[in-house]
């Protein structure tokens, strides 16, 4: 079911999310469906969006959903960085559509997680995907891209047209 995306300023976006527990697994299929439906609706509306974090729809759990060529579910992910190489880029967010933020991200990352079937997984990420998962992972810790702006002049407004 499509859920409301929490917007910049909502206090829930700044909370640290709890682990998905054994008792939570019964709710996981519904949560994943809600994340999927919400992401697809955002794509239809704005023509963009590749991933969403559970806290963005009010679920304070360590759960990420990404849809590229197929769906990816990351339960209780852990993100690490194999080296210190970083780069700057313009970042946006479903929680503040139209606002762009210049941030610094690691060029490479490794994410370890459980999938939607409780199987362990690991992905090495580089460039665009590394940045995407760092952005979504930050949501689990109550960190927004606006908090990672490289300086106080790194916020830009961008008008997005609604796809009709």
Residues covered by each model-derived region:
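Positively charged
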Residues: 1-164
């Amino acid at each position: 079911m499509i859920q409301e995306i929490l917007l910049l300023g909502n206090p829930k976006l700044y909370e640290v999310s709890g682990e998905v527990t054994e008792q939570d697994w019964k709710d996981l299929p519904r949560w994943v469906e809600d994340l999927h439906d919400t992401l697809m609706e955002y794509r239809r509306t704005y023509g963009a969006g590749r991933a969403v974090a559970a806290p963005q729809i009010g679920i304070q759990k360590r759960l990420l959903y990404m849809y590229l060529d197929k769906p990816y579910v990351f339960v209780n992910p852990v993100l690490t960085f194999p080296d210190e190489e970083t780069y700057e880029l313009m970042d946006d967010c479903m929680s503040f559509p139209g606002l762009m933020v210049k941030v610094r991200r690691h060029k490479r990352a490794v994410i370890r997680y459980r999938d939607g079937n409780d199987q362990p997984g690991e992905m090495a990420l580089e460039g665009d995907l590394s940045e995407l998962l760092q952005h979504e992972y930050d949501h689990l810790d109550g960190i927004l891209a606006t908090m990672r702006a490289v300086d106080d002049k790194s916020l830009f407004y961008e008008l997005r047209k609604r796809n009709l």
